[in-house]
Structure formats: structure tokens, C-alpha cells
């Protein structure tokens, strides 16, 4: 039984940071009634299997699939060059048998590329690289309860709203074709970084690494994760993977990461994003009633040692490879999936059901 483990990093940012989202309306029908036992805000589906009362099991909607575009490298490179501004230097390098443009301005390097795995855009201020690196280490250590210095919702000396507008402006330069975005904002103050430094230095010394590059690098930082949406629904994020490595059916999710200081955007990471294009005429009916039936069937075949709680059922889009007559093709299509989040012994996991055949996505 394959499950997608939810990265606690994302969960902490969602809980501790601020989420900016436009909420839409979904078609609903009357929930059906079942004979179950209420247990602390849950109902019992099977022995040791519970479903949250907050889930509308009568929800039903019809959604479309979308063709996929890989993107336009020339357009993406031009947008990146315009963002960097006057004085940007271009260097043509050969990678994977083709020419590729890398951009440099002052201490900032950037590039955009498009391949069979989608559109990639990266930007790094080399002077600020230690700050971004230390943020990642800081977050990881906090998740593992090794430090308790910041909740990643610190008061900083510049406006996170201004940082958010800079990120939105950056994204507007690219023709990504998504309906909307959710933005999750985390902030870490200079003082929190300075309090974390001794712990980081101790760990680096143990690993034989040099702490010198981190000295005097502490400053207020705003980190923004961006989750693209089709209609009202997010696409699968970077914590999700389907298929097998090196196979055509391998599919990774994506979200965008931006790091912003008072001086501006210092780091961008947009990795492997597929662009939705033409809307297909066929409709896909998504029913939470049917999803609950499939969940019940799934766990009927499993001997549960611990209680399992179904916390959330929602719709997410995924750029899955087209399959026909048992064959998998490089062509992809965004299609809606039913994402089921469960909790077992305090650990959150997620698995996906495909409403085209109501099988679990592997």
C-alpha cells in the first residue's frame, strides 16, 4: 500500500505562516446518512477507522481535464532577463547536447530551462546563499524539535505584504496559465538567526564544515511558498510523487519557493512545472460519497494495529502521463484526483484516488 508522506515542513509553514487564498464555491448535494458511532468529532467507518465530521460526504462536482504544455524556454529566459534588468550578462553553455543561456548580474545568477520535465526557473544571489541555506537548516532542526527559537512567524523590519507583491510581480512575468495561486508566508527575524547560529556552528564543526560564510549574514528574511491552482484546486505539491524513477509514469508535484530580504528577492526555485493548456470536453464526476466507499474498501483489506483517522478529503490536480490500452505515453494531461489525508499515531500521510476508475494512484 503506497502512501504519500506529507512533509512536515509544509505543514509548519501552513500553520505558523500566513496563507493568502481566494476561496471559491463548489457544487454540493445533501450528505447521505450512515449508521456510525461518533468518537470525538469523528464517525466510525470500520473498526479502528474513523472519518472527521468536518468532511462533507455528500459533496459532488464535475471537473474537466486539461492538456499540458511544457513551456517556452525563450520566453521564460526573456522574462528572467527583464526581471534582472539592465546590465544582465548572457552566457551560452552546452548542456545535454543543446545550447542553454545562463544569466548573471552583479552577484546574482539565474537561468530558465524547459524540457520533458516541464519549466524550471532558478535565481540565486550568491552573497545571500548562506542565509537561504541556514534557513533550510533552521527549519529542519525546528521540525525535529532540536531547537525552539522561532515559530517562523517573527516580526521583521520590512513588510511581508511588500515581499508578497514582489513575488506576485515575478510570477506575472511568466505565462504559466494557472487560474490562481495560494501563497504561504513564513518570516524569521535577524535576532532568531543570531540565536540559532551557535547551534548551527556546533553542527558544522562536528561535520568538519566551515562556518565562516555564515558569519555576519543574519538579517530579516521572508520565505514564500507558492502553490499553483487550476480552478479552485491546487496541483499536487513537491511532497508528492507518483510512478517509478526512470520510467515514463514518474510524476512529481511542484510548488515555488521565494526568499526575500529588505533588499528584494534573493532566491527563486520553480522546479518542473507543467503548464495547463487546452480544456478537454469530457467531464469527470468527483463524488466524496464514492471516495468514502473506496476508502472503506481499501481498509477492509488491512489489519489495523492503530486507529486511523481520515482528516481531510479534497481535490488536487496532477499532470499524469496519458495511458491507453495498457501503454504509457510521454504526453501528459492535468486531471483531478481525490486526495485523502489520514493520521495514524500523530503521523500525517496522504494517498490519492483517481475518479476515472476509482483506483489508488501508484
Predicted regions and their residues:
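Sec-dependent N-terminal signal peptides of Gram-positive bacterial secreted proteins and lipoproteins
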Residues: 1-24
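Segments that shape or occlude catalytic/ligand-binding pockets
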Residues: 166, 170-334, 339-348
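A short, surface-exposed interaction/processing loop segment used at functional sites
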Residues: 123-150, 250-286, 349-362
Amino acid at each position: 500500500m503506497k502512501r504519500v508522506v506529507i512533509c512536515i515542513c509544509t505543514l509548519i509553514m501552513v500553520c505558523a505562516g500566513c496563507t493568502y487564498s481566494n476561496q471559491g464555491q463548489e457544487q454540493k448535494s445533501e450528505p447521505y446518512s450512515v449508521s456510525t458511532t461518533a468518537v470525538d468529532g469523528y464517525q466510525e467507518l470500520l473498526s479502528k477507522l474513523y472519518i472527521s465530521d468536518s468532511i462533507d460526504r455528500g459533496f459532488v462536482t464535475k471537473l474537466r481535464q486539461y492538456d499540458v504544455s511544457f513551456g517556452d524556454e525563450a520566453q521564460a529566459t526573456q522574462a528572467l532577463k527583464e526581471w534582472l534588468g539592465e546590465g544582465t550578462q548572457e552566457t551560452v553553455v552546452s548542456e545535454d547536447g543543446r545550447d542553454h543561456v545562463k544569466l548573471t548580474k552583479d552577484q546574482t545568477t539565474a537561468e530558465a530551462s524547459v524540457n520533458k520535465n516541464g519549466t524550471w526557473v532558478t535565481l540565486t544571489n550568491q552573497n545571500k546563499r548562506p542565509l537561504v541555506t541556514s534557513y533550510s537548516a533552521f527549519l529542519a532542526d525546528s521540525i525535529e524539535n532540536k531547537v525552539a527559537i522561532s515559530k517562523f512567524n517573527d516580526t521583521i523590519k520590512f513588510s511581508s505584504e511588500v515581499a508578497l507583491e514582489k513575488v506576485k510581480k515575478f510570477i506575472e512575468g511568466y505565462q504559466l496559465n494557472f487560474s490562481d495561486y495560494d501563497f504561504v508566508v513564513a518570516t524569521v527575524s535577524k535576532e532568531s538567526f543570531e540565536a540559532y547560529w551557535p547551534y548551527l556552528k556546533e553542527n558544522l564543526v562536528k561535520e568538519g564544515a566551515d562556518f565562516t560564510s555564515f558569519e555576519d549574514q543574519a538579517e530579516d528574511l521572508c520565505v514564500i511558498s507558492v502553490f499553483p491552482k487550476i480552478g479552485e484546486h491546487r496541483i499536487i505539491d513537491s511532497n508528492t510523487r507518483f510512478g517509478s524513477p526512470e520510467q515514463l509514469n514518474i510524476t512529481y508535484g511542484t510548488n515555488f519557493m521565494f526568499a526575500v530580504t529588505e533588499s528584494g528577492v534573493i532566491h527563486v526555485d520553480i522546479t518542473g512545472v507543467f503548464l495547463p493548456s487546452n480544456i478537454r470536453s469530457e467531464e469527470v464526476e468527483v463524488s466524496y460519497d464514492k471516495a468514502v466507499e473506496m476508502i472503506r474498501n481499501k481498509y477492509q483489506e488491512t489489519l489495523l494495529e492503530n486507529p486511523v483517522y481520515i482528516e481531510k478529503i479534497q481535490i488536487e490536480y496532477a499532470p499524469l502521463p496519458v495511458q491507453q490500452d495498457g501503454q504509457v505515453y510521454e504526453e501528459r494531461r492535468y486531471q483531478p484526483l481525490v486526495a485523502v489525508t489520514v493520521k495514524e499515531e500523530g503521523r500525517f500521510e496522504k494517498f490519492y484516488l483517481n475518479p476515472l476508475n476509482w483506483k489508488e494512484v501508484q
